[in-house]
């Protein structure tokens, strides 16, 4: 009988110690489990329809035009072209697509493959923020629909002098063009 009592006490002590160790141990990621219980924010690709259309910057030494299809098949397809001195000096194929519960902006500068993914992290009726903290530059791409009907695209890096934010002010391309 004494042996059974000692065995029960030992087993109970072991369970208590294991429980305390799991609470106190930094290798156990309790915060992750709690975090994973939070509902994931879900975005709908249709909520990005305001990006669709034909956009251009004001004429100057260089001009950029950007074109986005309407939302269809879980994606928007885009392209951007920069013209300076009468020549195309840069172009980029773009895609915004739903992948499961997430939405990604995929950039293919100069048709480079594979593209670079930027995950949608914030979406309102007038602004979309796409991020890829592991990318060199940009780390963040922001599209904003302005009250006057224009579109602002902003690229941001880590905030250093080398990676200053850049804003691109687009207006709708007139039908006469």
Residue ranges and their predicted role:
Residues 23-35:
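Signal peptide processing junction and immediate N-terminal pro/mature segment
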Residues 2-16:
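Bacterial N-terminal signal peptides that target proteins for export
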Residues 16-23:
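Hydrophobic h-region of N-terminal signal peptides that target proteins for export
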């Amino acid at each position: 009988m004494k042996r059974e009592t000692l065995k029960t006490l030992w087993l109970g002590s072991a369970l208590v110690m294991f429980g305390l160790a799991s609470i106190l141990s930094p290798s156990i990621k309790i915060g992750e489990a709690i975090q994973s219980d939070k509902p994931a924010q879900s975005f709908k690709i249709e909520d990005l329809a305001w990006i669709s259309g034909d956009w251009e910057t004001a004429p100057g030494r260089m001009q950029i035009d950007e074109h986005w299809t309407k939302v269809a098949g879980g994606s928007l397809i885009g392209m951007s072209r920069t013209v300076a001195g009468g020549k195309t000096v840069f172009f980029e194929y773009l895609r915004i697509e739903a992948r499961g519960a997430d939405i990604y902006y995929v950039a293919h500068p100069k048709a480079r493959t594979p593209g670079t993914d930027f995950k949608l992290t914030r979406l309102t009726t007038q602004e979309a923020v796409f991020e890829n903290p592991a990318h060199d530059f940009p780390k963040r791409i922001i599209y904003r629909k302005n009250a006057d009907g224009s579109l602002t695209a902003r690229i941001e890096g880590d905030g250093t002098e080398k990676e200053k934010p850049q804003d691109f002010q687009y207006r709708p391309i007139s039908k006469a063009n």
